[in-house]
Regions:
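C-terminal juxtamembrane segment of a hydrophobic transmembrane alpha-helix
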Residues: 15, 20-41
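N-terminal export/assembly leader peptides and their processing motifs that target proteins to secretory
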Residues: 31-136
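N-terminal leader/signal peptides at the extreme start of proteins
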Residues: 1-8
Length: 136
């Protein structure tokens, strides 16, 4: 069966209309999909932030009562918008994001002064020394 020129044109127009409808549907759902992915990423970062703060609190508590010279290795997760400040006997963790109603804040306390810095995405060594805890 041969397709005539007029029918070829009709098939081409129908194919273009189908492709245009498909592109329109993709364009319609892309923003909704992007928003869902942003919400999922924020939820994952928040859970990771809470988990890390609990792990850090347990580690600091354990090493605070250990003998001088005791050390442990800890991975600081690379969480976007997380700030870490070390001040005296406390480590202040903050997760700030425009979609959060309030910043998530955690304070880790120690029986000893803490010296050093924590950088997101790096491994650190917590070492109990005489009268203090150092972060390397």
């Amino acid at each position: 069966m041969k397709i005539k020129n007029k029918e070829k044109g009709q098939v081409s127009i129908e194919a273009l209309l189908l492709w245009a409808a498909l592109a329109g549907m993709i364009g319609l759902f892309t923003p909704a999909f992007a928003h869902a992915m942003d919400a999922y990423t924020l939820h994952a970062h928040t859970n990771q932030f809470i988990s890390f703060s609990e792990t850090l609190q347990e580690t600091i508590s354990g090493i605070s009562f250990a003998a001088p010279g005791t050390q442990t290795l800890l991975q600081v997760p690379p969480i976007e918008n997380m700030t870490i400040e070390v001040s005296g006997n406390e480590i202040h963790l903050t997760l700030a994001h425009a979609q959060l109603a309030h910043d998530k804040k955690r304070t880790i306390t120690s029986a000893w002064p803490i010296e050093g810095t924590l950088t997101p995405g790096e491994k650190i060594i917590l070492r109990r020394e005489e009268g203090k805890i150092t972060i390397q």
